[in-house]
Regions:
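Conserved N-terminal entry element of GNAT/NAT acetyltransferase domains
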Residues: 1-11, 144
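Active-site rim helix/loop that mediates acceptor-substrate recognition in acyltransferases
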Residues: 21-54
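Conserved GNAT acetyl-CoA-binding A-motif
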Residues: 96-109
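Conserved beta-strand in the GNAT
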Residues: 47, 53-62, 66-74
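A conserved beta-turn-beta hairpin within the catalytic core of GNAT-like acetyltransferases
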Residues: 62-71, 80, 129-134
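Conserved acetyl-CoA-binding loop-helix of GNAT-fold acetyltransferases
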Residues: 75, 81-94
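C-terminal "cap" of GNAT-fold acetyltransferases
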Residues: 109-110, 129-144
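Conserved active-site tyrosine of GNAT-family acetyltransferases
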Residues: 20, 116, 121
């Protein structure tokens, strides 16, 4: 099975967390204590699979501003460059549109800002530190 699915079971959520830990905690050195947060239950989580194995994840939730906040986009290093990040973003943006959101916002690692810019996201504000990694806030309309 290949594709992106909405996480609907506890087992699939654990798989999504395993991808996040592999990318953010093990690979990038983000403290495990900040990887899981208070927004897990309210967020819609997505899981990318290749031959049934979890290779990527993302989530979206409604931000305080009312925009769709896309977060925790991660693809295992063994599957980067295969389009899974774009597929995860497509799924999150589509679900956000279905929920009535007309704008998406995200806090991108500066090293990934080009990926999001190619999808129509524009920088809003300056660089800031999150978990020891430089980030920038980016946003785009979802009606395009």
């Amino acid at each position: 099975m290949h594709g992106v699915e909405v996480v609907e079971t506890a087992a699939a959520f654990r798989e999504a967390l395993a991808v996040r830990y592999a990318v953010f905690v093990d690979e990038q050195g983000v403290p495990a204590s900040v990887e899981v947060d208070d927004h897990e239950a309210e967020a819609t989580h997505f899981l990318a699979r290749v031959d049934g194995a979890a290779v990527g994840t993302a989530r979206y939730r409604t931000a305080e501003s009312g925009a769709a906040k896309i977060e925790r986009v991660a693809v295992r290093d063994t599957h980067r460059g295969e389009g899974w990040g774009a597929r995860l973003m497509d799924a999150a943006e589509a679900r956000a549109r279905e929920a009535g959101h007309d704008r998406a916002v995200l806090d991108a690692q500066t090293s990934a800002a080009g990926f999001y810019a190619a999808r129509g996201y524009e920088r809003v504000g300056g660089v800031f530190d999150e978990a020891g990694i430089p980030h920038v806030t980016m946003e785009r309309p979802l009606d395009e």
